[in-house]
Amino acid sequence: MDNNEILLANPRGFCAGVERAIEIVERALQRFGAPIYVRHEVVHNKFVVDDLRAKGAVFVEELDEVPTGNTVIFSAHGVSQAVREEADKRGLRVFDATCPLVTKVHIEVGRMREQGRELVMIGHKGHPEVEGTMGQVKDGIHLVETAADVANLQVADPDKLAYVTQTTLSVDDAAAIVTALRERFPNIMGPKKDDICYATQNRQDAVKFMTPHADVVFVVGSKNSSNSNRLREVAELRGVPAYLVDNAAGIDPAWIVGKRRIGVTAGASAPEVLVAEVIERLKALSGASVRNLDGVPEKVTFPLPKELQEAR
């Protein structure tokens, strides 16, 4: 099979928020020792979670699973005000690994509600980021998942309305929902800057750039990763078969039969070591060479909590 090629999307994999969240857990373990409790998977990637668990992190879904006097870390997806209050009441030592770009949305929600506006949250029901963002206020916030949902929205005052979005949505889907909102509520207020984060946008753009040149696309990421699922959808919407795989073992050789150009990308919570393993497996199956595609360089970094900045 001559001239087979593996196309590597750029950028791909870890974003600044994920790197920060993982480092918070690792530094807390170094500084305070195991166990360190983490509310929800710190990022949605099985490999990362299993690795941190092996180092002494204990993942829980609710704070009542954390013994009094222990340390708890909030995941990158953010938490509601009720969770913060519960941690405070319990006297737990808290490190907040919420992505700063999610925190930005939390601040927007609080500010808009203080101005007396009702809010529309564009996002996926049940996703922890959505639950955390909607839980910034006690009432006056509605969830919309599709443009069709907009028609059923019941609001008190159409002129006192604002919207925010989950940070990991499909850029195109979110734009369609915003268009529907503006058509129905012309005076709706949006965020000064789009809530969909730079990493989500860049990774989706990289897949759009890659798909015209690819016969099949592999997205390295876990099934519960919102941004990874969106990358798969972006490829599929452009008529290219796409598969979400946790690792190299998830690849079915039948998927690349007759495919000369194989695209590879990774979600924002997928480590590069898994991408490397996927590439090696694809090379072994297809005899393909690897070509790195051009993309937007990312130089974003987020500071760690002060108490953990010195921990090594």
Curated annotation (Swiss-Prot):
UniProt-annotated binding residues for isopentenyl diphosphate: 44, 77, 127, 225-227, 269
Catalytic activity, EC: 1.17.7.4
Binding site for [4Fe-4S] cluster: 15, 99, 197
Cofactor binding, per record: Binds 1 [4Fe-4S] cluster per subunit.
Broadest EC class assigned to this enzyme: oxidoreductase
Presence of keyword 4Fe-4S: yes
Pathway: Isoprenoid biosynthesis; dimethylallyl diphosphate biosynthesis; dimethylallyl diphosphate from (2E)-4-hydroxy-3-methylbutenyl diphosphate: step 1/1; Isoprenoid biosynthesis; isopentenyl diphosphate biosynthesis via DXP pathway; isopentenyl diphosphate from 1-deoxy-D-xylulose 5-phosphate: step 6/6
Function: Catalyzes the conversion of 1-hydroxy-2-methyl-2-(E)-butenyl 4-diphosphate (HMBPP) into a mixture of isopentenyl diphosphate (IPP) and dimethylallyl diphosphate (DMAPP). Acts in the terminal step of the DOXP/MEP pathway for isoprenoid precursor biosynthesis.
Protein name: 4-hydroxy-3-methylbut-2-enyl diphosphate reductase
